[in-house]
Curated annotation (Swiss-Prot):
This is NADH-quinone oxidoreductase subunit A. It comes from the Bacteria. One of its GO terms (molecular function) is NADH dehydrogenase (ubiquinone) activity. Belongs to the complex I subunit 3 family. It comes from Rickettsia conorii (strain ATCC VR-613 / Malish 7). Its EC number is 7.1.1.-. HAMAP family: NDH1_NuoA. One of its GO terms (cellular component) is NADH dehydrogenase complex. The gene is nuoA. Keywords: Cell inner membrane, Cell membrane, Membrane, NAD, Quinone, Translocase, Transmembrane, Transmembrane helix, Transport, Ubiquinone. NDH-1 is composed of 14 different subunits. Subunits NuoA, H, J, K, L, M, N constitute the membrane sector of the complex. The keyword Cell inner membrane applies. PANTHER family: NADH-UBIQUINONE OXIDOREDUCTASE CHAIN 3 (PTHR11058:SF9). NDH-1 shuttles electrons from NADH, via FMN and iron-sulfur (Fe-S) centers, to quinones in the respiratory chain. The immediate electron acceptor for the enzyme in this species is believed to be ubiquinone. Couples the redox reaction to proton translocation (for every two electrons transferred, four hydrogen ions are translocated across the cytoplasmic membrane), and thus conserves the redox energy in a proton gradient. It is found in: Cell inner membrane.
Amino acid sequence: MLQNSELLQEYLPIAIFFGIAVLVSGLIMILPNLLSTKKYNKDKLEPYECGFEPFSDARSKFDICFYLVAILFIIFDLEIAFLVPWAISLNTIGKIGFFSMMFFLFVLIIGFIYEWKKGALDW
């Protein structure tokens, strides 16, 4: 077991790196606002479309199907994020780990079939 001083010595470089990263990120976000000149006019507030006059308002509505596909993508992308570490450690986790992941996949497959049957994937 590591003592407090040893633990501090182990994690001090990580804490310093994290602190510097937060400081640099904050500076990168704040400095342009402080140093730039702010001259707003009608042309700068318009959306830019490759040098042409805008055809319509840039704030157009999207069909709900796009949001649904995005949410389904995130859910099944997270499935892959869980599957990769499981596949790497498959030899060491034994039967309990195997059947837990099979149950997890079963629940996801049931959810996918439900979405399919409800017509969420039909356009």
